[in-house]
Structure formats: structure tokens, C-alpha cells
């Protein structure tokens, strides 16, 4: 592990999403039970201004309904089933997920929140997100290391908005281009970490050292193969997002 003495922290990608429907309360509860160090979610804004944990622009793939998240109210989303295999599940709001994470008393767990762009609401997504973090008292941590929330986006402007409004909140600039992540973009927007895909990291392992030299951590997604878990550990990746948090934790040495 070239960048530090400890193994990567394990982040449950959309919860324990290999075993439970993604972005459901059941998926996140299982991830926490399996010992995930962090949980990840994507957020989108409903027509009536609520942040919900949904990856796609539409609800077609993950629910019993169809349509754009941005054109539906929270009440309309609530009547859809986001579960599977006879276990119904309601849409999860960011507020509900934050409450779950903060109330989990066995250990502190970080929440990695990805804002999706381009969207019709633009900067309102980040504004609403910051308001929600402020409501829970986690928008202004004492330091980045002690932050309970990390904000991520593929959109550099979204990262910049967060850094400008809440400079102590850690941020991750996501991407699949080594040139983009290894260039000046992260510096320009003030990202505290870069987030390459595992494929990008396989092809360009030097990204980790390059980020570290600039004082940035590395967040790698989505790491499910045991060989890739070992690669991330060997390179010194800080955080790995996985659909299998329990299995991935078992592959790594204990902290």
C-alpha cells in the first residue's frame, strides 16, 4: 500500500446493492450491518424540491413505474415500488438516508453523495443538498478528516459550487479520463479527491501517486472483483466503492 499504512476504506455503492435493491433502506441497512466504512448514493431533485436517492433520470429501471424523476413529486414517487422479490420498498429520500447513517451508533460512517448532471434544476441541486446537510449539522465539519459527508460529481461546476459554499466539505471529482483527472481540472475546482473508474485505474495506476503528490485522495468505483480490490490496496487508494461491502471488507486487512 504505497500511499499509507492502512487498507482502503470500503464504501457501499448504492448500499449493499448486489444483495438488495439499490438505493433502498434495506440495501443501506445491510451495508451498515456488514461493516461498510461509508455508503454512497446518487441524488436527484423532484418536481416539488425533494432530494431522492435515484441513479437514473427515470424511475423505469428501478421501480414499478415510469417517468422522469424531475417531473414527479415526492408523493407520486412514494406510491411506486422500488423493491424486488416480493419485498416492497419506497423511494428513499436523502433526509432518510442521512438519519440512518447518523443514528448508526456502532461506528461513525461517512456518506458519499453524488449529484447528477446535467439536470433541469442546475445549481439548485447543490443548494438543496447544502441546506439538507446544514439542517443535520454536518455541512461545516471541524476538518475534512472529521466530515461525515463527502460530495461528488462528474460535473466540475458542481464540485466548484460545493467548495465555494462549504470549503471544509470534502469533494470528489469523478471521471473516466486519466487526462482529465490527472490534469488541472481538480485543482481548478478545488476537489480534495479524484474518482477514477476501476477500469481507468487499471490502465493508469499512476493516477494515485499523481493525486497524492497534489495532496488529494483517490476514490475508485466500482470495485467488485477481488483482483481489483487487491490492486486498489496495493496502489494506496483511499476509498473503494463496491456493490459487495461485506465481501470486500473480508478481503482487506482490518484497520
Predicted regions and their residues:
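Phosphate-group recognition and catalysis centered on beta-loop-alpha active-site segments
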Residues: 1-255
Amino acid at each position: 500500500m504505497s500511499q499509507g499504512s492502512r487498507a482502503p476504506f470500503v464504501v457501499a455503492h448504492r448500499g449493499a446493492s448486489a444483495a438488495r435493491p439499490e438505493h433502498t433502506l434495506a440495501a443501506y441497512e445491510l451495508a451498515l450491518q456488514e461493516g461498510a466504512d461509508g455508503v454512497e448514493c446518487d441524488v436527484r431533485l423532484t418536481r416539488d424540491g425533494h432530494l431522492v436517492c435515484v441513479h437514473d433520470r427515470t424511475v423505469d429501471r428501478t421501480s414499478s413505474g415510469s417517468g422522469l424523476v424531475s417531473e414527479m413529486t415526492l408523493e407520486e414517487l412514494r406510491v411506486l415500488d422500488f423493491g424486488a422479490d416480493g419485498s416492497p420498498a419506497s423511494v428513499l429520500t436523502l433526509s432518510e438516508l442521512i438519519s440512518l447513517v447518523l443514528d448508526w451508533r456502532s461506528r461513525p460512517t461517512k456518506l458519499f453523495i453524488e449529484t447528477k448532471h446535467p439536470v433541469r434544476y442546475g445549481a439548485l441541486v447543490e443548494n438543496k443538498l447544502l441546506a439538507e446537510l446544514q439542517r443535520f449539522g454536518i455541512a461545516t465539519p471541524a476538518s475534512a478528516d472529521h466530515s461525515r459527508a463527502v460530495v461528488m460529481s462528474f460535473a466540475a461546476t458542481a464540485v466548484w459550487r460545493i467548495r465555494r459554499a462549504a470549503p471544509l466539505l470534502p469533494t470528489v471529482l469523478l471521471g473516466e479520463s486519466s487526462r482529465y483527472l490527472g490534469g488541472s481540472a481538480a485543482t481548478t475546482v478545488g476537489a480534495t479527491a479524484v474518482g477514477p473508474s476501476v477500469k481507468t485505474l487499471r490502465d493508469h495506476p499512476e493516477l494515485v501517486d499523481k493525486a497524492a503528490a497534489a495532496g488529494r485522495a483517490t476514490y475508485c468505483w466500482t470495485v467488485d472483483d477481488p483482483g481489483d480490490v487487491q490492486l486498489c490496496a496495493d496502489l494506496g487508494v483511499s476509498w473503494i466503492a463496491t456493490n459487495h461491502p461485506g465481501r470486500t471488507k473480508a478481503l482487506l486487512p482490518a484497520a
